[in-house]
A protein has these predicted regions:
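Transmembrane beta-barrel domains of Gram-negative outer membranes and organellar outer membranes
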Residues: 5-148, 153-159, 192-198, 206, ...
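Active-site beta-loop-alpha junctions enriched in small/polar residues
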Residues: 37, 73, 123-125, 169-175, ...
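Flexible, surface-exposed loop regions and adjacent strand-edge segments
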Residues: 87, 226, 251-252
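Outer-membrane beta-barrel "beta-signal"
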Residues: 98-103, 185-187, 238-253
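Short, solvent-exposed loop/turn segments at conserved positions within beta-propeller repeat blades
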Residues: 143, 178-180
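Alpha-helical interaction elements
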Residues: 161-169
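Outer membrane beta-barrel transmembrane domains
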Residues: 183-235, 245-247
Length: 253
């Protein structure tokens, strides 16, 4: 079988670039990493502003059907937000923390070979304790990355060429700012060429991705440098704004 990487770097969970999918990591996989995030993908321009920021995260697949993650996104001080003094303006002084969870409710091929895998999940569901929380419409309030979803994934194998993954999801939240309420669709292709040359082996580490995340069309790739233990993720959000990061994995089982 083709190895699973699929590290959704902004949320610190398994996924494509921005949209959720139904793929799961190996049982007892510990995943951690960090990323540079473009301002175009950050949910609150009022809170963050127009600058690249950094996140870091840790994630564990506790059971083959359950994944839990914790993500932190750094924030710079700016005038008019949260009583920062002028000497701190433009410096990283805070971080937005969020929890994330994914539950596999149906495994691919359980009933018939054509049935997809199905996952339900949530991002940043209840961490907004300040002034209204995750359901608040004000950009300054917490729950910035809040969304709920159901996702389905189906794989198609092409012998000695690669594996195509087709992904569909419905994404929703109750916020006016960074609002989600619609379908998402995406695909990825991971090569599995015959390992007869250095080039073929190098290409086999590449995972190409494209998606419509219910708000924008994005493209990118993931590259595994050492099996799936060290991976790089690169996204062009709206096919032009760069974000990317490194993902590390430890298999505890």
């Amino acid at each position: 079988s083709v190895k699973v990487v699929y590290a959704q770097y902004m949320y610190g969970t398994t996924g494509l670039l921005q949209m959720p999918i139904a793929e799961m990591q190996r049982d007892k996989t510990l995943m951690f990493g960090g990323s540079a995030l473009s301002p175009q993908i950050i949910p609150s321009q009022e809170w963050w502003g127009n600058y690249y920021t950094i996140n870091y995260y840790i994630n564990v697949t506790i059971f083959p059907w359950l994944e839990i993650g914790y993500d932190c996104v750094l924030v710079k001080a700016k005038p008019g937000i949260y009583h920062w003094v002028p000497s701190t303006y433009g410096k990283f002084v805070n971080q937005d923390r969020s929890f994330h969870g994914r539950l596999r409710v149906w495994k691919e091929g359980w009933w018939k070979s054509w049935t997809p895998q199905i996952v339900v999940g949530l991002n940043d569901p209840t961490s907004g304790s300040w002034e209204g929380g995750s359901s608040s419409d004000d950009q300054r309030y917490n729950g910035f990355f809040c969304r709920y979803y159901v996702a389905a994934t189906k794989h198609f194998n092409f012998e000695k060429v690669g594996e195509l993954g087709i992904h569909g999801a419905y994404v929703w939240n109750n916020k006016n700012v960074h609002h989600f309420n619609g379908p998402a669709i995406g695909a990825n292709f991971r090569f599995s060429l015959s390992p007869t040359s250095f080039i073929n082996k190098a290409v086999n580490n590449l995972n190409l991705m494209a998606e419509y995340d219910s708000k924008s069309i994005n493209c990118g790739f993931e590259y595994s440098f050492w099996k799936d233990y060290i991976n790089a993720v690169v996204e062009l959000n709206r096919c032009k704004y760069f974000s990317g990061g490194l993902v590390f994995k430890i298999h505890l089982k």
